[in-house]
Curated annotation (Swiss-Prot):
Assembly with partners or alone: Homodimer.
Swiss-Prot/TrEMBL keywords: Cytoplasm, Heme biosynthesis, Metal-binding, Oxidoreductase, Porphyrin biosynthesis
Leading EC class: oxidoreductase
Domain of life: Bacteria
Pathway(s) annotated for this protein in UniProt: Porphyrin-containing compound metabolism; protoporphyrin-IX biosynthesis; protoporphyrinogen-IX from coproporphyrinogen-III (O2 route): step 1/1
Binding site for a divalent metal cation: 98, 108, 147, 177
Family matches, as Gene3D superfamilies: Coproporphyrinogen III oxidase, aerobic
Positions bearing the site annotation: Important for dimerization: 177
Binding site for substrate: 94, 110-112, 260-262
Similarity comment text for this entry: Belongs to the aerobic coproporphyrinogen-III oxidase family.
Gene label: hemF
Lineage, uppermost ranks: Bacteria, Pseudomonadati, Pseudomonadota, Gammaproteobacteria, Alteromonadales
Cofactor: a divalent metal cation
Protein name (record): Oxygen-dependent coproporphyrinogen-III oxidase
Amino acid sequence: MHNDYLKQVKSYLMSLQDAICQQLAQADGEQSFQEDSWDRPGGGGGRSRIMKNGAVFEQGGVGFSHVYGEKMPASATAHRPELEGRDFNACGVSLVMHPENPMVPTVHMNVRFFIAQKEGEEPVWWFGGGFDLTPFYPFDQDIIEWHQQAKNALDSVDEKLYPEYKAWCDDYFFLKHRDEARGVGGIFFDDLNDRSFDECFSVIKAVGDAFTKAYLPIVERRKNLAYTQQQRDFQLYRRGRYVEFNLVWDRGTLFGLQTGGRTESILMSMPPLARWEYNWQAEPGSAEEQLTEYYLKPRDWLSV
């Protein structure tokens, strides 16, 4: 029965990767994804799909992985000591797309499943995932519709989920060392196992299936907008924050590196270009200042 859990989730995730890659390539119109299949020496493997130098997407990746092993890594057992001594299977789809035009937001989505087993004991399993948006020059319409799509997806399972997962996202995608949010949020959840397997599985299916509905209309609206070199420079500066979050705070990155995951695939979320500038300050009253002073503050976007 429990092996069937893994089989069902893995099948869905591989289909999801196919569907998302097809739709993102269509939105780009110039480049398609190149697949790099890999095997993990300790058990498992995956399919990393990368797009570079597209008409819309400067670089991005959509990865599927299924890894397994005899011992849970420290990043997974730190907040769940009962997992010590269990073998594990972990599978997921994770993506980050970095558009070239600063008017188009960077986006991240992830859905994942863990199951940890020990002979003679009930397995421990859970789901996690979510999606979040990181604009550089935000538009209220985009942010509101993004959150509305997230709410619609979760409401199809349980209307209590969106407020909880929205707040969790605001809390998780936060750079503590900068005291600022990574973006304008979305939804995030982890350790989901407080209802039946089928109900929990339906949550990640709702999230996975909603991603392109939420993101692609934003891409279509913004991909042909004009921008200046100054705006491009600001985008690269803000991408630096993305790098900082992924390397310092992101639990998924740490899990991948600690389990001996494939470094190229784990770090495919990195932007192709980013920049840092010592003590840079935005002009008072500028769009750049408005990003941090207004947009990167947690707020109820569906009541704006």
